[in-house]
Amino acid sequence: EAVDAGAQFIVSPGLNPAVVEWCLSNGIPVTPGCITPTEIEKALSYGLKILKFFPADVYGGVKGCKALFGPYKSEGVSFIPTGGVDLGNLKDYVGQPFIHAVGGGFLCRTDDLAAHNFEAITTTAKKAVEILLGFEFDHMGINADSPEKSEETAGLFEKAFGFVPKFGNSSNFAGPSLEITKFPGLGQNGHIAVKTNSMPRAIHYLSRRGVEVDMETAKYKGDKMIAVYLKEEYAGFAVHLLEK
């Protein structure tokens, strides 16, 4: 009935073999609820790796998901927790490698829907996106033209303000928020780094807002992207994302 009404995927609170088998036979993506190793192994036998975790607050929340993820990490299992998730604890789930997505009725409260209070729903959704992305200033970069100049500049900040220098291969830091490159980098005036909880989500979000990233500048740690610059400079500063 749900598919006939236009549903393109099915999410269920538990793992009902009849429902799962019907969905697989009819090419409908399905995400069953699984809260025990037995249920997870049953889902894996169907080739399903993205699983609902419901009700999340009753079965341990982040700790519960993490505990179940441990023995099935190599299988690529991830969870969609729902039930008891709200703006207050949403941040706890963000960035965890075993969390595929998060759901909750807090995004669209029944009374707001009944009253057609779409402004309140929009405000809540925007706040949720802000929490998911977690954009924060991380550091500012100063372009030096040599390793010696970079070290000298870091020393000046230490002498004046007590910013303890940290020396690296391609740059030096004066305290946690000032990076002095050893050679001229991107940006006429230097660069600004903005942290985010999720690089893929941040790039998608920015692209939807017409902000382009320069994928040629992307840096990886293994298969995971950890930094990438925007194509546009802001007031002479190159801007790059940095995953927390």
Residue ranges and their predicted role:
Residues 23-27, 111-133:
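C-terminal helical cap(s) of enzyme catalytic domains, especially alpha/beta-barrels
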Residues 20, 40, 65, 90-91, ...:
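Generic hydrophobic/aromatic pocket-lining and core-packing "Φ" positions
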Residues 1-5, 38-47, 69-70, 85-101:
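Catalytic cores of alpha/beta
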Residues 122, 178-182, 207-244:
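Vicinal oxygen chelate
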Residues 7-16, 29-40, 49-59, 81, ...:
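Catalytic beta/alpha-barrel core
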Residues 129-154, 187-194:
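N-terminal beta-strand motif that seeds the catalytic metal site of vicinal oxygen chelate
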Residues 13-19, 52-61, 98-121:
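Glycine-rich phosphate-binding active-site loops on the catalytic face of alpha/beta enzymes
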Residues 141-181, 201-208, 219-226:
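Core segments of cupin and vicinal oxygen chelate
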